[in-house]
Amino acid sequence: MPLLNTLATPYAEALLQVTDGRSESDDVAAQCKELLAVWDSSTALRDAMTSPVLEPAAKKQALAQLLAEQIKPSLMNLLKVLADRQRLTALDAVLRRYLELYRESRNISLAHVRCAQALSDDQTKALTAKVQSMVGTGSVEIDLTIDASLIGGFVINIGSQVIDASLSGQVRRLGLSLAKAS
């Protein structure tokens, strides 16, 4: 188990236990996704919260002003604990681990899908249904990213399984088979 995952797991497990007890796991999971998106996209926020120069009290105050109205108290308490213990550098790992544990406890599979272009709602529903039938779990969560280098089609990653239905993948496979034939 990687060191960061070892550090993140106890915090994530504690948060899941608290949110399950308060019946707010679904809300907190959605808030974790939103917070991760902000954390990943805002270098200024990340730099400020992970700076050793800022005191934990200042970090807690800033987090409270930024997020208090938007997140559940249990998630805010986690952020404050991480700030107190100088562990905000691991925030993304803790949130990702929480989401993993949340999905595990709810029997939800995560499928990473790369598409050449954005999918319509109908295409997304059809893709979700197809992936769900392949996986066989209770439900599937789709993490969709646009990758123009695929030219057309999509690539699905579910755990260690990869399904490449992209045009670039077909061209690559055709090139390999032609190279073998010559």
Swiss-Prot record:
InterPro entries: ATP_synth_OSCP/delta_N_sf, ATPase_OSCP/d_CS, ATPase_OSCP/dsu. GO terms for cellular component: plasma membrane-derived thylakoid membrane; proton-transporting ATP synthase complex. It holds the Pfam family OSCP. The keyword Protein biosynthesis does not apply. PANTHER family: ATP SYNTHASE DELTA CHAIN. F(1)F(0) ATP synthase produces ATP from ADP in the presence of a proton or sodium gradient. F-type ATPases consist of two structural domains, F(1) containing the extramembraneous catalytic core and F(0) containing the membrane proton channel, linked together by a central stalk and a peripheral stalk. During catalysis, ATP synthesis in the catalytic domain of F(1) is coupled via a rotary mechanism of the central stalk subunits to proton translocation. This is ATP synthase subunit delta. It comes from Synechococcus sp. (strain WH7803). The gene is atpH.
